[in-house]
Amino acid sequence: MATQHPIGKKTACVVGGTGFVASLLVKLLLQKGYAVNTTVRDPDNQKKVSHLLELQELGDLKIFRADLTDELSFEAPIAGCDFVFHVATPVHFASEDPENDMIKPAVQGVVNVMKACTRAKSVKRVILTSSAAAVTINQLDGTGLVVDEKNWTDIEFLTSAKPPTWGYPASKTLAEKAAWKFAEENNIDLITVIPTLMAGSSLTSDVPSSIGLAMSLITGNEFLINGMKGMQMLSGSVSIAHVEDVCRAHIFVAEKESASGRYICCAANTSVPELAKFLSKRYPQYKVPTDFGDFPSKSKLIISSDKLVKEGFSFKYGIEEIYDESVEYFKAKGLLQN
């Protein structure tokens, strides 16, 4: 059993600490002087937790064993915390049974964590990482449409049409809706952060799938390029943010007393052909494809972060910086030539 943190420090629990977003969030919280508890499924998995063990040098970080399917496993890590960041989500893109592999565990995981929050009297606010996939997938027609926090993905369309990888947007949408329902019924101060596709660099030993997807036009990975096209066709745009800005947004809305509701975190909206043109010009040394035939060259919609910006948040990274860092990260990983 981990001992309590010293009194006087703000304490945060980050659920799912081995992930791309969560591990950087842990790092930023430690750098801000927080005491941090984080949960992982298997603390004995050296490959998965080595980067967290290194972060213990930055400050007061305790690692707990917890599983989204086991409500009681969150009691100890959440006890005494001011903020709880629920970042973990089950992802099985190749699943043949998304209902049981992703949707049910995501919803159950959110409810289990929030139940533990109701029992820990210290928790002031819960911050849930949702996804633009919970906002943008609907049957809106036209171009130049602006979507914001009022919009929700159309679950009936997803579950009836079952487009490729439909389980992920369905799980994120239903998990966020379950969180809002539980928060209202149990008087929890909940905020959701809604990031778009994330890139930059990662503390994890494995390359996150989202950076792989964002980098596909540069690496020439046909399977992932088709994934980007599918994203544009399904959600209406290729929208992107730097993972550090997404983590900064989580901390910003946790600390900002006036914050409430949902917050989209998106730095740039584009399309596959527009992005390819930009990347081809910026990195001529990589043979970025620019001919996409009759594939739509304009995005159908803009995902707006106006609410977050009006609250006082400012983005550190535009699309140039996002890709410069992602390219350097891929070079360091040996996935790109100089």
UniProtKB/Swiss-Prot annotation:
Entry binding sites for NADP(+): 18-21, 48, 87-90, 168
Designated gene of the protein: ANR
Organism this protein belongs to: Vitis vinifera
Pathway: Secondary metabolite biosynthesis; flavonoid biosynthesis
Function: Produces the terminal flavan-3-ol monomers required for the formation of proanthocyanidins or condensed tannins in leaves and flowers, as well as in the skin and seeds of developing berries. Catalyzes the double reduction of anthocyanidins, producing a mixture of (2S,3S)- and (2S,3R)-flavan-3-ols.
Protein's name in the database: Anthocyanidin reductase ((2S)-flavan-3-ol-forming)
Stretches of the chain forming a coiled coil according to its record: none
The protein's Enzyme Commission number: 1.3.1.112
Family, as annotated: Belongs to the NAD(P)-dependent epimerase/dehydratase family. Dihydroflavonol-4-reductase subfamily.
Reactions accelerated catalytically: a (2S,3R)-flavan-3-ol + 2 NADP(+) = an anthocyanidin with a 3-hydroxy group + 2 NADPH + 2 H(+); a (2S,3S)-flavan-3-ol + 2 NADP(+) = an anthocyanidin with a 3-hydroxy group + 2 NADPH + 2 H(+)
First-level EC class: oxidoreductase
Pfam families: Epimerase
GO BP of this protein: flavonoid biosynthetic process
Keywords, ordered alphabetically: Flavonoid biosynthesis, NADP, Oxidoreductase
Gene Ontology molecular-function annotations: anthocyanidin reductase activity; oxidoreductase activity, acting on the CH-OH group of donors, NAD or NADP as acceptor
Miscellaneous comment: Hyperbolic binding of NADPH and NADP(+) to the free enzyme, with a single binding site each. The most likely enzymatic mechanism is sequential ordered Bi-Uni-Uni-Bi, with NADPH binding first and NADP(+) released last. This enzyme is strictly pro-S stereospecific and the reaction mechanism involves two hydride transfers from two distinct NADPH molecules.
CDD domains cross-referenced by the UniProt entry: AR_like_SDR_e
